[in-house]
């Protein structure tokens, strides 16, 4: 086993303690359910929208004024009811349009989701100095990513796919895995 300078030894016995990276895409899975249900013209309860809005990983989107938990409920409810938003803020409007974009072609949406579901970051674990990291995908509105302690929160809508299938999915013109590695190393 090759050790790097960031490896830690436990109990002086030469046991390597590498970082652990946890990928969280629960919110993304919930959004897939919403997009599919709306596409199938099924009704979704506002309580489900509130469950998404109340998820602790969604807090990075909230600013207390332009975008709140109520914004998430309002936007997703409007989408579910096939309605336009009444007097939306800029962030609500962006969140609405990004979600509507997902509904245009579920095949395209699934192409964006596939690299997230297949993401394996175990080969990065020996490169990282902290013990544990979280990589979280959320349906954001404006920002590409957020960093909070050992947590990297990525706006799912920042993923760009190659329609022809020749190239990898990217974020900010970098393959997703490379992008994540760069962000994790900067933490």
Language model regions located:
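N-terminal low-structure segments adjacent to metalloprotease catalytic domains
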Residues: 2-111
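Intrinsically disordered, low-complexity coil segments
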Residues: 12-15, 164-168
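General "foldedness" signal
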Residues: 41-44, 48, 147-151, 166-168
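Charged/polar, solvent-exposed surface patches and flexible loops
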Residues: 50-51, 60, 74, 122-126, ...
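Generic surface-pattern signal
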Residues: 54, 77, 81, 126-130, ...
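Auxiliary, metal-adjacent structural segments of Zn-dependent hydrolase domains
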Residues: 92-164
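Active-site recognition of the HExxH zinc-binding catalytic motif
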Residues: 165-187
């Amino acid at each position: 086993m090759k050790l790097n300078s960031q490896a830690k030894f436990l109990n002086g016995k030469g046991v390597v303690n590498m970082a652990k990276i946890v990928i969280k895409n629960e919110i993304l899975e919930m959004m897939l359910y919403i997009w599919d249900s709306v596409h199938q013209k099924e009704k979704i309860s506002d309580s489900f929208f509130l469950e998404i809005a109340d998820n602790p990983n969604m807090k990075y989107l909230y600013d207390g004024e332009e975008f709140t938990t109520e914004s998430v409920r309002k936007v997703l409810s409007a989408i579910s009811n096939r309605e336009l938003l009444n007097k939306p803020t800029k962030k609500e409007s962006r969140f609405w349009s990004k979600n509507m974009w997902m509904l245009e072609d579920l095949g395209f949406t699934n192409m964006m989701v596939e690299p997230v579901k297949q993401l394996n970051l175990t080969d990065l674990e020996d490169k990282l100095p902290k013990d544990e990291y979280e990589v979280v995908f959320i349906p954001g509105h404006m920002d590409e990513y957020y960093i909070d302690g050992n947590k990297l929160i990525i706006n799912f809508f920042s993923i760009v796919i190659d329609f022809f299938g020749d190239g990898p999915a990217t974020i900010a013109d970098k393959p997703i895995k490379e992008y994540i590695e760069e962000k994790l190393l900067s933490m």
